[in-house]
């Protein structure tokens, strides 16, 4: 897979590719990454890439010209192009899996009030939000997508580990709690079932803990789990 990132501030992105795991994945040829400065494509003599919005309003908008030139340079129309934006499709594990099957991704990092809509209309395949909050940097959101995608590529992580992660099993539950040595820590002990060596009992315990954790932390996913099983939780509200 190749990932190309278009950014006003490449220095935010590049250190990520120097961390030990990512560097190893790149050296193996599993993934290649390129960070391109949008400013290099601006036709403004001062390399300015933003302007005031038509119709008025606060903040500045990223201009179409430099981003269009950068996208044409990387031949974005033949690749899967993403714009990270708080108004985009909410990101989830399924979308991460879908993106991991693509050969090439181009990610546009937003800034300021947003991006000229004509770039989205002309080039963008997916407008993606990483959550219901606003970031000052599209680069941070781009790194979330990159990190969630590359770890799904063959040869990066043991496939069995991926199957047990939150959001990854067919039932959509969160992952169960984990424990390691020592057995006792500040008065709290490891659940005895995990020391029993009884694999079926351990599996059942982990499954029940996944249900409990999902109900507590992600009630929306818990309701989806019940719906999938054809069940309900009585009055359809938290207990």
UniProtKB/Swiss-Prot annotation:
Sorted alphabetically, the keyword list is: Cytoplasm, Methyltransferase, S-adenosyl-L-methionine, Transferase, tRNA processing
According to its UniProt entry, one GO biological process term is: tRNA N1-guanine methylation
Alphabetical list of Pfam families matching this protein: tRNA_m1G_MT
Its localization reads: Cytoplasm
Named from the GO MF annotations, one term is: tRNA (guanine(37)-N1)-methyltransferase activity
Task: Say which domain of life the source belongs to.
Answer: Bacteria
Say if the entry is tagged with keyword Repressor: no
Q: Where does S-adenosyl-L-methionine bind?
A: 110, 130-135
How would you classify this enzyme at the top EC level?
transferase
Q: What does this protein do?
A: Specifically methylates guanosine-37 in various tRNAs.
Family in the record: Belongs to the RNA methyltransferase TrmD family.
What is the protein name given in its UniProt record?
A: tRNA (guanine-N(1)-)-methyltransferase
At the highest ranks, the source species' classification is: Bacteria, Pseudomonadati, Spirochaetota, Spirochaetia, Spirochaetales
């Amino acid at each position: 897979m190749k990932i190309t990132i278009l950014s006003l501030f490449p220095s935010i992105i590049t250190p990520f590719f120097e961390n030990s795991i990512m560097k190893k994945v790149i050296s193996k040829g599993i993934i290649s990454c390129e960070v391109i400065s949008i400013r290099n494509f601006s036709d403004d003599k001062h390399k300015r890439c933003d302007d005031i919005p038509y119709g008025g309003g606060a903040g500045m908008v990223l201009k179409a010209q430099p981003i269009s030139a950068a996208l044409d340079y990387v031949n974005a129309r033949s690749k899967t192009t993403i714009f990270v934006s708080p108004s985009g499709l909410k990101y989830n594990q399924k979308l991460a899996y879908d993106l991991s099957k693509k050969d090439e991704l181009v990610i546009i990092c937003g800034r300021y009030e947003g991006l000229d809509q004509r770039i989205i209309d002309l080039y963008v395949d997916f407008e993606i939000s990483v959550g219901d909050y606003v970031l000052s940097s599209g680069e941070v959101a781009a790194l979330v997508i990159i990190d969630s995608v590359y770890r799904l590529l063959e040869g990066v992580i043991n496939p069995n580990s991926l199957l047990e992660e939150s959001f990854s099993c067919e039932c959509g539950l969160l992952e169960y709690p984990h424990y390691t040595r020592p057995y006792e820590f500040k008065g709290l002990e490891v659940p005895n079932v995990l020391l029993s060596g009884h694999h079926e009992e351990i599996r059942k315990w982990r499954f029940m803990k996944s249900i409990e954790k999902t109900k507590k932390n992600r009630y929306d996913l818990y309701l989806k789990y019940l719906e999938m099983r054809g069940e309900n939780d009585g009055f359809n509200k938290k207990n």
